[in-house]
């Protein structure tokens, strides 16, 4: 196999983009926004329960799907198409979070679970592509490049979102009530 630099960089830059979901949505702002905007802010135990259930349900769904998706990925002919499908599914549902009105926690949880299933499922196909773009000798260095770019991309977007959240007046196009919606 001859290594193609363009394929290596494309693979690594996907991690740059998809790690932003993990840092910004999953770890950073969805839990905050869920508790303060969609769920009842006066009942943190209830919102913690709903968010915990959402995380449990998506994890169970992904655990059930993973062996089947992994088998499909091992066959090799549909890796890229399925990566695109699941990434698109996750992107659409994440983008949809910005149109969900305050108090509609059920819809927010549904969109979040579908987005996270898309994110996790796309990673199955993303991970399987490394053997198609890197020689056995280079797998570690290519994987490290993707991992490093993922941390960089996720960290930079998280920093930008923290600034947007703490100092919304820096960004004129944000409206006070919906400032967090644009984080998604």
What residues fall within each predicted segment?
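C-terminal ends and interior cores of transmembrane alpha-helices
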Residues: 63, 83-105
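Intracellular juxtamembrane helix-capping segments at the cytosolic ends
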Residues: 119-138
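Hydrophobic alpha-helical transmembrane and interfacial-helix anchor sites in secondary transporters
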Residues: 69-74, 164
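Helix-loop boundary and gating motifs at the non-cytosolic
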Residues: 2-59, 105-109
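Loop-to-transmembrane helix entry/capping segments in MFS-fold secondary transporters
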Residues: 45-49, 136-147, 180
């Amino acid at each position: 196999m001859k290594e193609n630099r363009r394929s290596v960089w494309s693979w690594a830059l996907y991690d740059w983009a998809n790690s932003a979901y993990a840092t910004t949505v999953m770890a950073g702002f969805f839990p905050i926004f869920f508790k303060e905007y969609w769920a009842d802010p006066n009942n943190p135990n209830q919102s913690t329960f709903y968010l915990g259930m959402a995380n449990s349900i998506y994890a169970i769904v992904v655990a059930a799907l993973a062996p089947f998706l992994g088998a499909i990925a091992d066959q090799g002919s549909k890796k890229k198409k399925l990566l695109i499908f699941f990434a698109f599914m996750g992107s659409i549902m994440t983008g949809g979070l910005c149109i969900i009105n305050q108090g509609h926690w059920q819809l927010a949880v549904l969109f979040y679970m579908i987005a996270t299933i898309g994110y996790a499922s796309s990673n199955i196909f993303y991970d399987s592509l490394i053997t198609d773009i890197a020689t056995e000798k280079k797998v570690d260095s290519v994987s490290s490049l993707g991992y490093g770019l993922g941390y960089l991309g996720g960290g930079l977007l998280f920093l930008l979102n923290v600034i947007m959240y703490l100092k919304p007046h820096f960004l004129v196009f944000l409206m006070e009530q919906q400032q967090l919606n644009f984080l998604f």
